[in-house]
Structures are given as structure tokens and as C-alpha cells.
């Protein structure tokens, strides 16, 4: 009689875990609901490839600045600075833009074959520039002798290096319809001639290994060595007016006689004697002083005898050079 209630009670006690289990099931259901939420980042996985194209557009880190070896033999060559380089285009340029750039290159190639052999694209524009190539900034290339591209390259070589690296992806789009001969001109292959190699000649490098080549004049520090400097040098006008020289002092016979007498008395005149003599002869003190100096120099040159101090210094090896005194033309006798 008591067992059924116990069994019933036991069943009643076991019932509460049922809701717990149901709650657990509900919890499991909630976990099941949260499980679809966890893969919600999975739709972001298609967007994950977005950073992947960035390495294609983003240029590789620019190489450290290197010093191009160039020699005077290369600079003196008639074709110096006029080697052809594949034109550069920006990474964001569309296929139509690349095609337009290709058309511009074909026109320039036609102009080259017409006789402008020195016109060649050499430097690349910054990334914000259009996809058209720049012509060689050599003074023989441009009719006005200006070098806009050279100025940009000299101002910021690192920007031009980055633009050249960023242009690698868009070259294939813009140059797809061109033949190698039309694309690369006389070379007919995706290669560039490097000036200033170790052996002094030209070196062919494939397009994949193509470094950014700068002409030698970029490294010149004098503006006269650059193509942008004027080819004609203006001659400085010589001064037609001669510098006014003091007229030669003409001593009178009385003045010369008085000066010679003072010189016989003492070859070195004192300041007091010089002032009194200049006042007496109506001469400037500097004229009296210079006359005494010239008189001593003339006697020394005529006799060739050095004073005792000079001989003493020469014996010690401290005075071994001969001195010549420039005589003033004002000396008169």
C-alpha cells in the first residue's frame, strides 16, 4: 500500500528532471540557434579575398636607392639617354585607358621612324599621372630643350620608382594588341638597355628583372650638365670703361734733388721726416713713402747683394727663395 505512493512519489520526484532535460533540450535548441550565428562570419570569407588583389595593385617595396655606374664613354655616345623603355601605366587604369596609351605609343613610334630617333620614353610618371608615356628629356629630343620629366624625377625619384612598380599589372591590359616590334621599338623584345654597365657597354635585361634606370645626368649636381640648361651660353659683357688709374706723378727737378738728398742721409725715412718733407715739397706722404721704397728696391736689384738678415736665414735654410720687387712706374729720376 505504501509502495505505490513511493513509486508515485519517486515518479513525481523524477518528473522535475524532465523539465530540466527539456530545458536542456531548449538549451540545446538555443545552442542550435547560436550555431548558425557562429558561421555568420563565413559570408565575410568571400570578402577575405579582397585583400588578396591588393598585393597585385600595391607595388612591391621600392628597392633601396642604388648608384648607377656610368662612365664618360657612355655619356659621350651619340645615343646616350635615348634608350627605349616600356611605357608605364597606373595600377588603377582600365583596359580602355591602357589601349589609349598603346595608341599614343604607336603614334610616337611612327614619329620616331620619320626621323626623330632620339625621342624615347625614359622615365615614368607618378601614380596619379595618365597612362601615356613620357618622352626622353634629352635636349636633342625636345624641340624647346625642356625636361619636364627629368625635373619630376630629380625632385622625387622614390615616387617615380613606386609608379614604375605599380605599373606592372596594367601593362598587359594596355599592350595586349600590340606586336613586340611596335611595343618595344627597335629592340623587338620586352627588354631594356641598361646604360653604364660594369664593362662600359649595354646590357639587356628581361622585363621581369627590369630595374628603374635613371640617366646619368640625374646624378649631376651642376645645372649646366643637365638637358634642361640652355644650350647657348651668354657671353659676359666686358667692361668697356677702363678703371681709372691715378696719373703718374711727375716730380720736378727740385723735388727729385731734395728726395735724393734725404735718401743719401738715411735710406729709411721716419714718419716725422716724411711728414715734414711732404709738407716742404707740397707732396702727399704716400708719394714720398713710395719713392723711398722704389729707390731701395732699384738699388737692391742692381747690386744683387742681400742684407745680412737674409744671408743668415738662408744659411739656416729658412730663407731659400729669391724675392723680386715690382717697381712702381711712379719712380722717376
Curated annotation (Swiss-Prot):
Q: Which is one GO molecular function term here?
A: DNA-binding transcription factor activity, RNA polymerase II-specific
Pfam families according to UniProt: Engrail_1_C_sig, Homeodomain
User: Bias category Basic and acidic residues: which stretches?
Assistant: 1-14
Tell me where in or outside the cell this protein is found: Nucleus
Q: Which InterPro entries match?
A: Engrailed_Homeobox_TFs, HD, HD_engrailed, HD_metazoa, Homeobox-engrailed_C-terminal, Homeobox-engrailed_CS, Homeobox_CS, Homeodomain-like_sf
**Major location category of this protein:** nucleus
Report the protein name in the record. Answer: Homeobox protein engrailed-1
Q: Which organism is it from?
A: Gallus gallus (Chicken)
